[in-house]
């Protein structure tokens, strides 16, 4: 089945219609009904509850969550994909029990209004807000960010209403079922990867700001510096040799770890910065990308404990940094990667024109 273009999806969102967006098979492998929150009516809530049957949620920007004074449901996010649920909400006025389609639509409208105030909603309630990552799908390739992107691109406030599509037997609908669902209900359907690719053509959140040679103990690298215009973080890329889009490039996307990179503590199965640079130097070409996100204190403490106990703590994938790293790699001309990492799942990196052809384990 031919998928719809992003332009077609945006136009339907602009008209107050619902669309379906699918993510990658190696992530949630699900499809969500998505629409702009400002256009949501009782009939849309009823359709989602009756036909899609997933959890009806309301993605919104961090700024709107702060405006409505919505704290995160859990101070430390332990979910597999980093979905940021806030406390649930209800409209302060105009609702009864809060669960009916009309009541939930009223709550969505109260929270999405351009002049919304914290006093317009109460907690708990029957609508579940999700805080989107600043930068949208260029920062995190999730349905939360996709809903806010589509609403913004269609001229609405960056907030939406989403609901996962489930099969009649309660299992999650995959691509074949989602395409059949879209055809049955005359709903346009697309992918998050296509949305990312569309945004990459028209906008980006990471800009190159400087480039200079770097003479290191492991060879003569080229240092390219980038700034994230959304978060303000500075990222650095160490490149060596010629980067060819048609040939796999040896790549390390590295988060600094004081134990591993400064104190040189051995951590089996993990690449140190020095080891990654040495591997690129030995190969004669490649990229070591240093992401400028600060070290999480809890993660650092966990690594200290694992060093003392000779155990290994699994560090969760930080999906919010995948977008920044992908933009930088694409800017450097990387397309195919031999990634210095244990096998990991990345959602919709094909939208950045990137492909992992091999995972290279640490020695």
Model feature map: region roles:
Residues 1-363:
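Catalytic domains of riboflavin
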């Amino acid at each position: 089945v031919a998928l719809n273009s992003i332009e077609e999806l945006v136009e339907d969102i602009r008209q107050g219609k619902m669309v379906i967006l699918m993510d990658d098979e190696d992530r949630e492998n699900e499809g969500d009904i998505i629409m702009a929150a400002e256009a949501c009516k009782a009939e849309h809530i009823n359709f989602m509850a009756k036909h899609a049957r997933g959890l009806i949620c309301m993605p919104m920007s961090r700024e709107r969550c702060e405006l409505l004074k919505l704290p995160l449901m859990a101070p430390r996010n332990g979910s597999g994909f980093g979905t940021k649920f806030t406390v649930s909400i209800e409209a302060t006025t105009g609702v009864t029990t809060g669960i009916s389609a009309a009541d939930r639509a009223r709550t969505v409208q109260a929270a999405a209004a351009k002049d919304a105030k914290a006093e317009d909603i109460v907690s708990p309630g029957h609508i579940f807000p999700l805080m989107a990552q600043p930068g949208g799908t260029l920062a995190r390739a999730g349905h939360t960010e996709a809903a806010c992107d589509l609403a913004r691109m269609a001229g609405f406030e960056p907030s939406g209403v989403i609901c996962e599509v489930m099969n009649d037997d309660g299992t999650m609908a995959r691509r074949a079922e989602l395409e059949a669902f879209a055809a049955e209900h005359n709903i346009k359907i697309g992918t998050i990867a296509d949305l990312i690719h569309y945004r990459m053509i028209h906008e980006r959140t990471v800009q190159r700001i400087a480039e200079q040679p770097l003479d290191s103990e492991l060879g003569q690298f080229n240092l390219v510096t980038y700034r994230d215009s959304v978060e303000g973080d500075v990222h650095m890329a160490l490149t060596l040799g010629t980067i060819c889009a048609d040939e796999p490039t040896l790549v390390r996307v590295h988060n600094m770890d004081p134990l591993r990179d400064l104190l040189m503590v051995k951590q089996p199965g993990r690449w140190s910065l020095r080891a990654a640079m040495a591997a690129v130097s030995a190969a004669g070409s490649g990229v070591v990308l240093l992401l400028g996100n600060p070290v999480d204190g809890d993660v650092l403490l966990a690594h200290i404990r694992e060093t003392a106990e000779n155990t290994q703590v699994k560090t969760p994938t930080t999906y919010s940094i995948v977008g920044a790293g992908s933009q930088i790699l694409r800017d450097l001309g990387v397309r195919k990667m031999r990634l210095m990492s244990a096998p990991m799942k990345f959602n919709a990196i094909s939208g950045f024109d990137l492909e992992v052809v091999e995972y290279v384990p640490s020695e």
